[in-house]
Amino acid sequence: MSLLTPTTSEVVNQAFVEHCCLAYQMDHEGYHGFDHWMRVLHNGRLLVEGEHANLKVVELFCLLHDTQRRNEHVDPQHGQRAAQFAGTLRGDWFELTDDEMDLLTEALT
C-alpha cells in the first residue's frame, strides 16, 4: 500500500492509515475504499500547495471523509459520522487546535 506521503506529515503514517482501514465497514475494493482515499489524499496535497491551506486538516479530511460510509451510493450521514469518528481520534492519533478541529468538522459535514 502506497501512502503517497510527503517527506514529512504530522498525521499520515502507516499505523494511522491502517487504523482508518480497520474502521471502514465496507469492501476496500469498492468505490470509496483505500484506493479512493489515496487519490483524494494525493489531490488534496496538490491543492494545499496552490492554496496555502492547512495541510494537517486537509490530510485528515482526505483520509477520514469516507471511513464511516455504510453503502457505496446514497449515505447522507456519512460525513457526520466521519466527523464524530475524527473526534474520537483527536488526542490519541492526532493533535488539532480547536479552530483546526472546527475546520475539519465543517469539511467533513
Where are these regions (language model features)?
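Non-catalytic interface/linker regions that flank or bridge core catalytic/transmembrane domains
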Residues: M1-E10
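An amphipathic alpha-helix signature
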Residues: S9, N13-E18, L41, G79-G87, ...
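Active-site palm subdomain of RNA-directed nucleic acid polymerases
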Residues: G50
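Generic alpha-helical segment signature
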Residues: S9-N13, G33, W37, L60, ...
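Active-site flanking loop/helix segments enriched in acidic
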Residues: A15-G44, D66-N71
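Divalent metal-dependent catalytic cores for phosphoryl transfer on phosphate-bearing substrates
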Residues: A53-T109
